[in-house]
């Protein structure tokens, strides 16, 4: 089996693949203070809950945008499974071209999202990933990563609003039923979610206007909050919640791993 781990600023997502099939997955809080032993214990526990043993893991692959966590988690994977994980970054030999000015600065999650899109859809695609940041990443049908846009994520914006104002309450993010909020929590939901949806639509239209070949790219969404925003955004055509993990699986194959 393949153990695939994507370390993001807020959450770490772990997936277990049998062949090309994602058999199980789970989310952990990204905690830089965790020791390799603690990470190893956590991974072992989650594998057991999934009905799997660490001995069934034949290959492992890690992507990270949190350098302080990367080494410890890689050590944890090797301790738990005896398998040294491959690590994906801008130097990895993958079947896409990072056609940008600073390829080594492109986040691993952005690389994986566009790799998955290129391999799955074989068409020009914009991937909108709703994470700690909301990213818009552009990949052509022939696998050229063109760059993209990065804006504050939904929870990042919401948390900043709450922290920066004395009287606004913390509010659960739920779909707003109207734009004009009759209560403060309604007004916050409308501002954060409808504001994000309209920002997505506006930025996607701007990206389409700059697209090099004049074709209309496919627009897909991924990330933990994609299903919340997608119904509110006119430009999003489909949601693929496990796109980054799929990218890790594709990267593992491209790097010669077997499982």
Describe the role of every protein-language-model region.
Residues 2-6, 61, 125-129, 220:
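Short glycine-aspartate micro-motif
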Residues 43-59, 203-215:
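Phosphate/pyrophosphate-binding loops at sites that engage ATP/ADP/AMP, CoA/4′-phosphopantetheine
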Residues 47-78:
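Phosphate-bearing ligand-interacting subdomains
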Residues 81-84, 217:
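A short helix->loop->beta-strand "cap" motif at the edges of active sites that frequently abuts
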Residues 83-87, 92-164, 193-208, 228, ...:
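Phosphate-binding/catalytic loop of phosphoryl-transfer enzymes
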């Amino acid at each position: 089996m393949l153990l695939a781990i994507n370390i993001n600023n807020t959450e770490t997502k772990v997936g277990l693949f049998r062949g090309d099939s994602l058999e199980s997955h789970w989310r952990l809080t990204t905690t830089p203070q965790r020791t390799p032993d603690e990470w190893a214990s956590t991974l072992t526990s989650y594998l057991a809950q999934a009905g799997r043993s660490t001995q069934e893991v034949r290959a492992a692959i890690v992507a990270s945008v949190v350098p302080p966590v990367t080494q410890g988690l890689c050590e944890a994977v090797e301790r738990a499974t005896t398998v040294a994980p491959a690590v994906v970054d801008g130097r990895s030999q993958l079947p896409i071209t990072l056609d940008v000015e600073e390829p080594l600065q492109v986040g691993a999650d952005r690389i994986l999202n566009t790799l998955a899109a290129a391999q799955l859809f074989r068409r020009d695609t914009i991937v909108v990933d709703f994470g700690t940041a909301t990213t818009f990443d552009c990949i052509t049908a022939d696998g050229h990563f063109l760059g993209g846009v990065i804006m504050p994520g939904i929870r990042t914006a919401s948390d900043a609003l709450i922290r920066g104002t004395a009287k606004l309450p913390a509010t659960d993010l739920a779909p707003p039923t109207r734009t004009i909020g009759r209560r403060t929590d309604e007004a916050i939901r409308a501002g954060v979610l409808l504001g994000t949806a309209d920002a997505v639509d506006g930025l996607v239209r701007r990206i389409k206007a700059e697209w090099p070949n004049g074709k209309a790219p496919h627009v897909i969404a991924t990330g933990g909050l994609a299903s919340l925003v997608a119904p509110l955004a006119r430009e999003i055509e489909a949601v693929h919640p496990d796109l980054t993990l799929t990218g890790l699986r594709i990267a593992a194959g491209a790097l010669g791993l077997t499982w």
